[in-house]
Amino acid sequence: DDMKALYAGFDLCSPQTSVSMTINGPAPTVLAFFLNTAIDQQIDRFREENGREPEASERATLRAYALEIVRGTVQADILKEDQGQNTCLFSTDFSLRMMGDIQQYFVAHNVRNFYSVSISGYHIAEAGANPITQLALTLANGFTYVEAYLARGMDIDVFVPNFSFFFSNGMDPEYTVMGRVARRIWAVAMREFYGAGSRSHKLKY
């Protein structure tokens, strides 16, 4: 109900709406609240337009539509929580399983316009890392998620497009090339090591 009140007046399934949630440890719970709110908005619209409750098949169609259309990002980067913020609510293994559960849900329900994780170097830099260390740890975290999701049987070309990245910036000269270097390393690894398709080569930040 709180999430519904928060987004009252916003069409969460509009192409012009994208919601970014900077939440990590509680990400699965908050994301579930958000996605259910988007679904409920579609059901409420159906009631208003048709003057009745949707049937089970209609409700399923509305649910599938909302999940396929809704846009946004949930940070949910548990590894940088441990490395840069020391705020890991759960064990690393358990947190990785929860992140995998989120991505598995996205795959199963064709959630293609929502980033399931924003792999974040910014916080690592704020904790004292120089640009090179920030980049190295952030990419390592990204590859860790790739390996974890592959181990669960997910297709790399289905889940990697749900990844985004987040880096800091500054006056150090390395920052002038960090984005290009990150994209190069990611693309080469996706192509040469993982055999992924061209869409997975794109590091988005």
Model-derived regions: residue spans:
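Catalytic alpha/beta active-site cores
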Residues: 1-178, 193-196, 200-204
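Conserved, mostly hydrophobic/aromatic
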Residues: 186
